[in-house]
A protein has these predicted regions:
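Contiguous, well-folded functional domains in the mature portion of proteins
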Residues: 1-164
Length: 164
């Protein structure tokens, strides 16, 4: 493989879960891209999600954010169907177009409010338009991770597809 490797780190502490277990076909079917999900630790009430890569915050919603790093865009979704909460239980600490480093705080969210609203607290972390074959060094399901721990790597293959 040629190209540079981008490390995608965990935005929250928790347990790694396969995307196939996310109760939303957009993620479980890898329609938006490949990656993993992180299940918040039992008993967690509020968590501050951090940037999984260094880059530019290109989209920020209370329940989700996207960070662009090189040719890749990483989507972090805080819970499933949490768009229906209309921002309740979420506090944003960053602004769109802000330059972020790995570990910079982006959004604090209430796991308690997500679960009270009967939504899944699983947090998918995906690289948009990627496939499982694009990912390397994938952290195994069931592994406990802290914020900033490696989830997986993806290689920038843009130089391989330069003919247009």
């Amino acid at each position: 493989m040629t190209g540079e490797s981008l490390q995608i780190c965990s935005p929250i502490p928790g347990r790694v879960v396969g995307l196939s277990q996310v109760p939303d076909l957009v993620f479980s079917g890898m329609i938006v891209g490949a990656g993993v999900a992180v299940k918040p630790n039992p008993g967690a009430t509020k968590i501050t999600a951090v940037s999984p890569v260094s880059g530019r915050l290109i989209k920020l919603f209370p329940h989700a954010f996207m960070v662009s790093s090189g040719e890749q865009i990483v989507l972090v979704h805080l819970g499933v169907d949490t768009v229906k909460m209309r921002g309740e239980g979420f506090t944003c600490h960053a602004v769109e177009n802000e330059k972020l480093n790995v570990g910079d705080p982006v959004t604090t969210f209430s796991v308690t409010q997500i679960e009270k609203a009967k939504h899944s607290s699983l947090c998918p972390v995906v690289v948009l338009d990627s496939t499982p074959e694009d990912l390397e060094n994938l952290t195994s399901e069931g592994i406990q991770v802290d914020m900033g721990d490696l989830l997986f790597e993806i290689f920038d293959l843009s130089s391989d597809t330069s003919s247009e």
